[in-house]
Amino acid sequence: MNDHTPDRYVTFLGIDCDAKADRMMEMLSARLASTDSPWVRYFEQKLAEKARMATDNLHFVGSQINSLYSFFEEAEDEEGLDLLWHLEHNCC
């Protein structure tokens, strides 16, 4: 590779996927706390499963990518959608 474009199939070096997944989880928590969307109950259940299975945040984001897109679209959260897109295309 001669360019500086990250190749997710070779390495995650320089992408900082874990920190970005942590940020996504912070954004999710903040959104869940400020809405009465039906998604709240769904994500509460999924987060409880995550805790029981002791999976990391990147695994959770990858497993819930479509639901997260729907939730952040419903919330009209462009920052969340942008971060989610980045995670999906560079980390998952």
Curated annotation (Swiss-Prot):
Q: Which InterPro entries match?
A: CowN
**A Pfam cross-reference name:** CowN
- The transmembrane segments are none
- Specify the signal sequence span: none
Q: Name one GO biological process term.
A: nitrogen fixation
Q: Which UniProt keywords apply?
A: Nitrogen fixation, Plasmid
Show the HAMAP family listed in the entry.
Answer: CowN
Question: Briefly, what is this protein's role?
Answer: Is required to sustain N(2)-dependent growth in the presence of low levels of carbon monoxide (CO). Probably acts by protecting the N(2) fixation ability of the nitrogenase complex, which is inactivated in the presence of CO.
Similarity comment: Belongs to the CowN family.
**Name by which UniProt lists this protein:** N(2)-fixation sustaining protein CowN
Task: Give the species this sequence originates from.
Answer: Cereibacter sphaeroides (strain ATCC 17025 / ATH 2.4.3)
